[in-house]
């Protein structure tokens, strides 16, 4: 992995060196959405630019928790982690704990009241201040709190340590201008701020120059991009411009808002070959009455119409969604409307949430809060329906050849099986068998496989005779370089798999050979942690 240094310079910090003269180590723990994942890359980049080094599995001198504030269990996760870290800190001389992100922006001093052993609290608008705050807290031997109410510097100007050598996130905007009654994000991340197209494309080009072949464009509402500079077609133009970057094979984006999803975006998706046939489109509810109560400025008929137009121009596109069950005032009739829309939409996957009261949102004080047992029963019915649909949609792919970008960190790992994993063009997760005598693909290489089995959350491609078809890529070369730089054992790229069934130790995910296909697995498009994330 590499640090891509953008415009901002993070000075070296004296606090990054311990009393023994060694560089102090850090660990970043991330809760929540894909925005937080990308923010954590910036936090890591800023810390390393200041002189800190990764803990790499050891007990870290600095623990940074990047928080989410969307659901109640996000609070529970934070304070559970902090409770555990209290005892660790007592025996670890000089250890520092920092809490940032949305929950820090919301709770501010409350975090220190509940966990006085925390050293630094910072918000969503000043991530670049972390090294300075750690140094000040260490020097003064007192906690530092710095929460800004508005964005001063666009975070993409910060040094960034990418989690992947072959795929990267690129923020096109931060904040949100919508006023959904269940969502606290606009209050914590502010109004929408758009980056200029030239800055975005320069960052994409820099990623490609580093070896990346896949980029995901990020925003709370990507298709409202351009609102700040008055161009309603700015997002479709951005997709087309990114599509012209040589060497960029896959472009994804998340998340759009149905109310602002226009025909020019659909045309750009269909006419730009490296924009992937995948769409994550949050539904939230299939009831028009509930959508009004949520302040979602579309109705179910419009939503389904968008899906029809997307599929007309991108046949076979995989569409995923978010759905909230048990929103205040939801009746059985409202819920049946949601089931009806889900059946009609034929989502490849859905991230489903039981409504969680978030103080500070209009929905928190609405009448008609649905009893927990009713929410659970409806939630179970929705899950059962979507599992059936996901399986039926995946079964349609059996016998088809799919092109995979070989990945790391996908699915379960088991050193005794020969299955590796990758993402199809439509982002479906595919676990594939490595035939005897085949070239071993590296993360970032492309493999062509034939689907042999289907489950609701993934596909299986067992060997069908003959060697695996692999296309070596610049991204695979970049992965090799990153492995060499980290002093890891050289990969088996270019070699041959042993003829006998044995172990493949590549740091790649695998599945148990005899695992039942009906068992729960990784979501088809895991853009965030569905237990505490948001779109």
From Swiss-Prot:
GO CC terms: cytosol
Its EC number(s): 2.8.4.3
UniProt signal peptide: none
Cysteines paired by S-S bonds: none
Residue ranges of domain MTTase N-terminal in the record: 24-139
Residues noted as binding [4Fe-4S] cluster 2 in the record, renumbered to the chain: 176, 180, 183
Functional summary from the UniProt entry: Catalyzes the methylthiolation of N6-(dimethylallyl)adenosine (i(6)A), leading to the formation of 2-methylthio-N6-(dimethylallyl)adenosine (ms(2)i(6)A) at position 37 in tRNAs that read codons beginning with uridine.
PANTHER family with a match to the protein in the record: CDK5 REGULATORY SUBUNIT-ASSOCIATED PROTEIN 1, MITOCHONDRIAL TRNA METHYLTHIOTRANSFERASE CDK5RAP1
Cofactor binding annotation: Binds 2 [4Fe-4S] clusters. One cluster is coordinated with 3 cysteines and an exchangeable S-adenosyl-L-methionine.
Residue stretches making up the TRAM domain: 395-465
Keyword 4Fe-4S tagged: yes
Cofactor(s) the record lists: [4Fe-4S] cluster
Catalyzed reactions: N(6)-dimethylallyladenosine(37) in tRNA + (sulfur carrier)-SH + AH2 + 2 S-adenosyl-L-methionine = 2-methylsulfanyl-N(6)-dimethylallyladenosine(37) in tRNA + (sulfur carrier)-H + 5'-deoxyadenosine + L-methionine + A + S-adenosyl-L-homocysteine + 2 H(+)
Region (Disordered): 512-535
Subunit structure and binding partners: Monomer.
Domain Radical SAM core: 162-392
Name the record gives this protein: tRNA-2-methylthio-N(6)-dimethylallyladenosine synthase
Designated gene of the protein: miaB
Keywords, sorted A to Z: 4Fe-4S, Cytoplasm, Iron, Iron-sulfur, Metal-binding, S-adenosyl-L-methionine, Transferase, tRNA processing
